[in-house]
Curated annotation (Swiss-Prot):
Name of the gene: rpmF
Organism taxonomic ancestry: Bacteria, Thermotogati, Deinococcota, Deinococci, Deinococcales
NCBIfam families: rpmF_bact (TIGR01031)
Region (Disordered): 1-26
Record key words, sorted: Ribonucleoprotein, Ribosomal protein
Record field: compositional bias (Basic residues): 1-23
GO MF term list: structural constituent of ribosome
Protein name, UniProt field: Large ribosomal subunit protein bL32
Domain of life where this protein originates: Bacteria
GO biological process: translation
Length: 60
């Protein structure tokens, strides 16, 4: 059976936190729908009215 490598030294809290500094989640940007003025994601169909790019794509 092969032996796996193990850490030689304990990772400090500072090193651990510096490694995790890029792991934060970001809030998606919400835009106003030009048809119903509800909130929607960019480049997505509006969940309130079903419009995308000025035309109705989904019957809501």
């Amino acid at each position: 059976m092969a032996k796996h490598p193990v850490p030689k030294k304990k990772t400090s809290k500072s090193k651990r936190d510096m490694r995790r500094s890029h792991h934060a989640l970001t809030v998606p940007a919400m835009n106003d729908c030009p048809q119903c003025h509800g909130k929607k994601l960019s480049h997505h169909i509006c969940p309130n009215c079903g419009y995308y790019d000025g035309r109705q794509v989904l019957a809501v």
